[in-house]
């Protein structure tokens, strides 16, 4: 669970909503630090070429209440699950935070 600005966000609920988009193959949602909210939802998505973050966010506006929509979206080319089909969420979270620091 991600606590963002006092609101509870359940990653599985957000992931399921993202995966309903016709161009999305897979999604993982992790919590990343946020100066204002404590944490915020960050989506890692495998999608068809040409899919934009805005396209995903517009789609989610009809699927989720506003506070559950990820504040950031990152498209990933590599598989989001390991060979056993498991998501290594803590490792993905740390990798995402590191990429954000490097891009800041």
Which residues are covered by each model-predicted region?
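AMP-binding/adenylate-forming catalytic core of the ANL superfamily
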Residues: 1-68, 94
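Short clusters of hydrophobic/aromatic residues that line enzyme substrate/ligand-binding pockets
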Residues: 2, 80, 87, 92
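Intrinsically disordered, low-complexity regions of eukaryotic proteins
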Residues: 17, 36, 76, 84-85, ...
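Short amphipathic alpha-helical leader/targeting segments
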Residues: 20, 53, 74, 99-100
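AMP-dependent adenylate-forming
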Residues: 54, 89-104
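AMP-binding/adenylate-forming catalytic domain of the ANL superfamily
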Residues: 65-86
